[in-house]
Design a protein with these regions (language model features):
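A conserved beta-turn-beta hairpin within the catalytic core of GNAT-like acetyltransferases
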Residues: 73-84, 94, 141
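Conserved active-site alpha-helix within GNAT-family acetyltransferase domains
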Residues: 100, 116, 124-142, 147
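Conserved GNAT-family N-acetyltransferase fold
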Residues: 54, 63-68, 82, 87, ...
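Acetyl-CoA-dependent GNAT
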Residues: 8-9, 19-26, 33-79, 148
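Conserved acetyl-CoA-binding loop-helix of GNAT-fold acetyltransferases
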Residues: 86-89, 95-108, 135
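Residue-level recognition of the GNAT/N-acetyltransferase active site
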Residues: 90, 123
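A short beta-loop-alpha structural element at the N-terminal edge
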Residues: 2-16
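Conserved GNAT acetyl-CoA-binding A-motif
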Residues: 103, 110-122
Length: 150
């Protein structure tokens, strides 16, 4: 299994993984117009040195993805935290330990980048994901809020 930075040619497979989700199936699509928006976002992520879009490959096939963002902050006398986003594992590879390996890989990445903590959020509708993150050692220590602008 390989953990690699995503390339533009991986984008269609990444979008498919985003769709293969309780919420993604209604909000993600690969129409021509949508693909242009995904491509623009992908290129912006790649340009940002604090962002990594990771794909997990097995036998040259993408089976999982996640986005990692290093966030510098002033509190605690300054430091960095790693934000984990958009963790998706192909349905045929779920419940086989891959998600735990991905989180361990992300935590190792955070340590190499001298981050003080790793954080993530999960939609409250994703009960299984919340349970999974708790099993990985994450604590529900904060209440998150979002304000959608579009």
């Amino acid at each position: 299994m390989q953990y690699l930075e995503a390339k533009i040619e991986d984008l269609t497979d990444i979008i498919s993984l985003l769709q293969d989700d309780i919420l993604g199936k209604t909000r993600e699509s690969i129409t021509k117009d949508d693909f242009s928006a995904y491509k623009k976002a992908f290129l912006a992520i790649k340009k940002d040195l604090n962002n990594r879009l990771i794909v997990v490959k097995e036998n040259d096939k993408i089976i999982a993805t996640m986005q990692l963002t290093i966030i510098p902050y002033l509190t605690f006398a300054g430091g960095k935290r790693l934000q984990i986003e958009a963790v998706r594992v192909h349905s045929s590879h779920r419940a086989k330990g891959l998600g735990q390996k991905m989180i361990a890989w992300a935590v190792s990445f955070a340590k190499k980048k001298s981050c003080h903590l790793v954080q993530l959020t999960s939609n409250k509708e994703r009960k299984e994901a919340i349970s999974f993150y708790e099993k990985c050692g994450f604590k529900a220590s904060h209440e998150g809020f979002k304000l959608y602008l579009k």
